[in-house]
């Protein structure tokens, strides 16, 4: 049986994990967190992509959205603003789990609205970097 293929997709400013607002996002870099995920899921082919550019995130969704088994997507601030990302997720077959490191409902009111949730199979947030692990487990259980 072939390995399941899952993309971990991060949006704007998530390239600064480990440096940016550690009180909210923690001290771990995404490289460190991704290495931990690879160790935790040795039977899954995990890929990682990050962009600060909305169009590049859309292109990546289109690129893998008909061949991968799942996408773990932290759209960052685009979560609250991007109809285009919602539409890109709706346009593909691959299930997408929306992920947030922080509990967005304990933060600013504008973060309480997600424009992509309706296109995703589920949402996981508030568990720090462990939110990514939980999302992968959810995708594997589908």
Identify what each model region corresponds to.
Residues 2-6:
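Extreme N-terminal starter segment of soluble prokaryotic enzymes
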Residues 12-14, 76-79, 102-104:
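Short glycine-rich anion-binding loops that position phosphate/pyrophosphate groups of nucleotides
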Residues 16-31:
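Glycine- and acidic-residue-enriched helix-capping/strand-helix junction motifs
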Residues 47-55:
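Short beta->alpha junction loops
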Residues 47-48, 97, 106-142:
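Short, glycine-/small-residue-rich phosphate/pyrophosphate-handling segment
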Residues 56-60:
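Short acidic active-site motifs
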Residues 64-71:
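Short acidic/histidine-rich motifs immediately flanking catalytic phosphotransfer sites
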Residues 82-91:
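Short Gly/Thr/Asp-enriched flexible loops that form oxyanion-binding sites at enzyme active sites
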């Amino acid at each position: 049986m072939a390995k399941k293929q899952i993309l971990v997709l991060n949006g704007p400013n998530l390239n600064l994990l480990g440096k940016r607002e550690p009180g909210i996002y923690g001290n771990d870099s995404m490289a460190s967190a991704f290495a931990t995920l690879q160790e935790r899921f040795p039977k899954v082919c995990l890929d990682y992509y990050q962009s600060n550019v909305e169009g590049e995130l859309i292109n990546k969704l289109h690129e893998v959205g008909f061949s991968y088994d799942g996408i773990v997507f932290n759209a960052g601030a685009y979560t609250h603003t991007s109809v285009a990302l919602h539409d890109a997720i709706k346009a593909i077959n691959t299930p997408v789990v929306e992920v947030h490191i922080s509990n967005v409902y304990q933060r600013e009111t504008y973060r309480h609205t997600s424009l992509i949730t309706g296109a995703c199979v589920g949402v996981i947030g508030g568990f720090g970097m462990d939110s990514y692990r939980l999302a992968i487990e959810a995708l594997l259980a589908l």
